[in-house]
């Protein structure tokens, strides 16, 4: 029995064993989760380790509108276009979080004729990786509080416990809570809160680990709090790294699915880019690089967030070598950054589209700082006019930018052929080897300022008192050699979501700096960024339903826009 794509009847899904066979994986190399998705065994990954790397294509974007610019859709469509040109290609993407799926942006599996399948399964639980991360994280939380409750032999100061709890849902009411109420039998009262699962350090660690040994070692190094005399307390001090790792046994294995055009896709891990590193697992990406000639991966939000972190954190840790950046832009986003109200973005306005290119230009120039080539993917929406598309293409080409319009949502791989050909052309003339923006052994303040000034355009940094105290502890205990993973709004190049276009002469405010010693980076938290989102007035949950036959509706993202872009 064949399975028809519930969203588009033009393609049939193939059994996952058939998809695996196209990239050299046998049925013994995978563990099937139903008929159309599977985990890839670690033994299979080891078997292909000696193969040469494929060309790694990183998809990023200009500063997005609140609805996103279709970066996941473009990533999938580009992979399909490369496959149409006869290139062995795999898409390596992140898993959706339930928070955005039920929140403002909806599903995260692409759109139109450029999706990953099975859509509903991937958006809702998938292979339970997020549930495993949530359980592992909260086990450590429970063990920390249990240690304080029972004799507190580690001398943990409850006021200085830094390890919060997580939930894979948008819920502003859990950001700040008090636990341990109801008398001594119910624990030691203290203030804490919940973050969303994609911001969990366990998620970051999972996406930066290649083996159970490495995973367990990183978990052992997690900082959970401080003692009464300000000495750090690590997860290893609690002797619980083995139990936490055990919960992640299957979550470490990459997931294999397929696109609308039956191109293999490895979907694994899901850290957000505004509050974490924002890319899929290095294990999944490395596997894809061994099994294909071209790998298309994405980094969340604009280039200032996910892509910067990819170059400065993920690629060095993973030994990855991105050779080209595909920078997604839309006429809608260009008009938005020219000051056009969201309600008027569907009205034709070529002049505004060109005026908004200041934001796009900044991202394009930033890419050059990492010594990699770039092509702009002008992702077409149904509301775009030919006049607008042509005006943007002319303006970009007049400035010497590489640009290719694409209609990937409507046409699938066919709509991305020009983009694929331009990408291959640039790859043919590109040498390997990118350059990091800063060295990890620089002072923490220098690393933060380098990113803020070079990538965002800030003129200085304002450290709040808590951040200053954090810096003292970071330097005292030797965490200062870690890279910085700056948490910042995705809606602006600055830390103020209201500053659109190309902000100038602004100061970035650092409220605090969290230590993610297990994952191996520091998290300066800027502006008003939150690690637990809230639901909008009209969340996507209101549009999701299931009928008597079990058919789910409303999960696919509106307009095909990824909730992770």
Swiss-Prot record:
Pathway assigned in UniProt: One-carbon metabolism; tetrahydrofolate interconversion
Q: What EC numbers are recorded for this enzyme?
A: 6.3.4.3
One GO biological process from the UniProt record? Answer: tetrahydrofolate interconversion
Cite the binding residues for ATP.
65-72
Q: Which InterPro entries match?
A: Formate_THF_ligase, Formate_THF_ligase_CS, P-loop_NTPase
Q: What Pfam families does the entry give?
A: FTHFS
Entry annotated with the keyword Ligase? yes
Keyword list, A-Z: ATP-binding, Ligase, Nucleotide-binding, One-carbon metabolism
Group of enzyme by EC: ligase
Q: What Gene Ontology terms describe what this protein does at the molecular function level?
A: ATP binding; formate-tetrahydrofolate ligase activity
Instruction: Report which superkingdom the organism of origin falls in.
Output: Bacteria
Quote the catalytic activity from the record. Answer: (6S)-5,6,7,8-tetrahydrofolate + formate + ATP = (6R)-10-formyltetrahydrofolate + ADP + phosphate
Question: Which NCBIfam families does this UniProt record tie to the protein?
Answer: PRK13505.1
Provide the family line. Answer: Belongs to the formate--tetrahydrofolate ligase family.
Stated name of the protein: Formate--tetrahydrofolate ligase
